[in-house]
Amino acid sequence: DGKEYQAISAPAQINKTMNDSGKSFTIDAKITRGNGNLTYETTNEKIATVKDGKVTIVGRGKCNIVIKASETKEYKETEEKVTIKIDKGYQKIKVPVTSYKKYVSDKNFKLEAYVEAPGDGKVEFIANENDVVKVSKDGEVTILGPGTARVYAVATGTNNFNRDISDAIVITVEDKKSDPDIKNNVPSSNVVISFPSNAIQL
């Protein structure tokens, strides 16, 4: 029929991570030869959806966005593929309190941390080897003795996000202060010795 194919300009591949989950972006595609209308389709809606050229990230993996230039009187229908690659995202752990000062006689207490969206890992706590505190996975701290210990909050790795570890939570434990000894708290009297102004000088 003598018709030519059209030419579509578009990126070969677009890389994103799961931190972009739910976010949309536009593919920079245009017809450089031809006069058809562009339409867009995804090959896997579990990874990315597309509407009017706007792509929304759904899940991890790889799919294609198929861009078609419709047939016209002068040109054939033409197709171009853009690969969308979605990698695992990184997680961010929020730790409201990062240092504690305790005494040996204090009761157990609980550490706090959470994973910021869109991260979906579970938070667990781990401590460096020490004889100051014992820490359970869910963050309950039992005091063992005086000293300093470092504890870390860990966001577990998932299908969509990599494992992540927080900065150190520092726990300092001191021996309990003893009650002030009343006897030792008596203020010392200041003794003032004055000499008469007419004292004989040798």
Q: Which residues fall in each region the model found?
A:
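Solvent-exposed beta-strand/loop surfaces, strongest in extracytoplasmic domains of secreted
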Residues: 1-202
